């Protein structure tokens, strides 16, 4: 299970008394191993969760931000097909299933956030159903702006830098196609790049 939290405090202030759990650090690009018999909560940074199909294709499952939980619903056989990757440097705190079930605040927090996870999954499924690649890419960028964007000049600035290959994998196309479409989107004013090469998604697309 991975679910997003709004402000960071939503997911962290409710855990007073559990913040003595040690933090684990992973660098940007690292693959994070699933937490055995439990889950990770993000203290700082952003993770992406994907699943590999039997045919070797990567299916994007969503993103998780500070306060979010990752991995609670990975069954034993699913752990081999799921991949958790750090999109930024991340600090994670691990919780066992026993700790979750025995702490009312922690359990309630996980349950409350589940609806956000469901909405994100539904949005990704809807995007995957678009027939045209440009519509899938535009839909993905809009969702990224909602989930990972920060308001700024010209629109929503993505807080992480995503490669064209990562975007291509997410919508089932090629890197070359994504590069071409992003160029067209820039010409049309739908997206831009800031000084740090972060994508800025124009509002109203």
From Swiss-Prot:
Its main location: cytoplasm. Residues 131-204 form the HTH crp-type domain. The keyword Transcription applies. It is found in: Cytoplasm. Keywords: Cytoplasm, DNA-binding, Sulfate transport, Transcription, Transcription regulation, Transport. One of its GO terms (molecular function) is DNA binding. Gene3D superfamilies: Winged helix-like DNA-binding domain superfamily/Winged helix DNA-binding domain. Pfam families: HTH_Crp_2. This is Regulatory protein CysR homolog. It comes from Synechocystis sp. (strain ATCC 27184 / PCC 6803 / Kazusa). The lineage of its organism: Bacteria, Bacillati, Cyanobacteriota, Cyanophyceae, Synechococcales. The gene is cysR.
């Amino acid at each position: 299970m991975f679910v997003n939290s709004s402000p960071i405090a939503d997911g962290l202030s409710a855990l007073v008394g559990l913040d003595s759990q040690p933090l684990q650090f992973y660098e940007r690009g690292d693959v994070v191993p699933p937490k055995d018999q439990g889950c990770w909560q993000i203290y700082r940074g952003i993770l992406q969760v994907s699943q590999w199909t039997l045919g070797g294709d990567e299916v994007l499952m969503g993103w998780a931000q500070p306060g979010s939980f990752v991995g609670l619903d990975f069954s034993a056989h699913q752990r081999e097909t799921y991949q958790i990757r750090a999109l930024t440097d991340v600090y994670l705190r691990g919780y066992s299933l026993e700790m979750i079930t025995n702490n009312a605040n922690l359990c309630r927090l996980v349950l409350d956030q589940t609806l956000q996870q469901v909405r994100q999954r539904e949005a990704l499924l809807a995007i995957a159903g678009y027939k045209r690649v440009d519509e899938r890419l535009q839909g993905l960028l809009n969702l990224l702006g909602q989930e990972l964007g920060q308001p700024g000049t010209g629109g929503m600035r993505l807080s992480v830098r995503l490669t064209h290959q990562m975007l291509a994998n997410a919508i089932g196309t090629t890197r070359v196609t994504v590069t071409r479409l992003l160029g067209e989107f820039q010409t049309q004013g739908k997206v831009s790049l800031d000084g740090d090469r972060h994508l800025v998604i124009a509002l109203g697309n």
